[in-house]
Swiss-Prot record:
Documented EC number(s): 2.7.1.237
Assigned protein family: Belongs to the GTP-dependent DPCK family.
Protein name: GTP-dependent dephospho-CoA kinase
UniProt function note: Catalyzes the GTP-dependent phosphorylation of the 3'-hydroxyl group of dephosphocoenzyme A to form coenzyme A (CoA).
Domain of life: Archaea
Keyword Nucleotide-binding on entry: yes
InterPro entries in UniProt: GTP-dep_dephospho-CoA_kin
Species for this entry: Saccharolobus solfataricus (strain ATCC 35092 / DSM 1617 / JCM 11322 / P2)
GO biological process: coenzyme A biosynthetic process
Binding site for GTP: 55, 57, 74, 76, 128
Metabolic or biological pathway: Cofactor biosynthesis; coenzyme A biosynthesis
């Protein structure tokens, strides 16, 4: 086990063994943008915070006048570099996360960011896809977590104890490896 000089353990959860399970949507799959945007607008009116994981879903909301409380992006859509963002935020964070993994430290980072009342943008050097897991575990009850389902639409997770249980179940099946 490698310990960095900043006293953080260099371990990751690896999900290679869970590709099939993770390819299914873990929330409500919206295939119609109009219905999706109406749902998000009503959720905001009810006081839910909107958290996006992925460049495409973040951009769709922004283009429709909805600025998420927190965006987790890596600058790519389907592994292709996306255009620069039009909206800047007061708080911007940078993290590193390898494809197909979640670094242990990301859980604490997301928890701290989601405690902040201002939200912001998390720029991921690497890949953000699996960061739905720590975001969902750290989000408040009733928060809305959105991620893209490639070639299908947007998946909306309404955070509650049942979904946290499902996410913990996935996490327990992951393999711990050195990053």
């Amino acid at each position: 086990m490698e310990v960095r000089n900043n006293n953080k353990v260099n371990l990751c959860f690896s999900f290679d063994n869970l590709r099939n399970e993770l390819s299914r949507p873990y929330g409500i799959l919206f295939i119609n943008n109009k219905i999706f945007l109406e749902f998000i607008s009503k959720s905001i009116q009810r006081g839910s915070r909107i958290i996006t994981v992925g460049d495409y879903v973040s951009r769709v909301l922004e283009e429709n006048g909805i600025v998420p409380f927190l965006e987790v992006i890596d600058g790519k859509t389907k592994r292709t570099i996306t255009q620069n963002r039009a909206i800047t935020r007061n708080k911007e964070y940078k993290v590193t996360n390898e494809a197909g993994k979640i670094r242990f430290e990301i859980f604490e980072i997301m928890e701290n960011i989601l405690k902040d009342r201002e939200g912001g943008v998390v720029f991921v050097d690497g890949e953000e896809d699996l960061l739905v897991i720590p975001v969902t575990l750290s989000a408040n009850h009733g928060d809305i977590v959105i991620y893209g389902q490639p070639n299908a639409g947007a998946v909306v997770i309404i955070v509650n104890e049942m979904i946290r249980w499902r996410v913990r179940d996935i996490l327990e099946k992951a393999i711990v490896k050195e990053c």
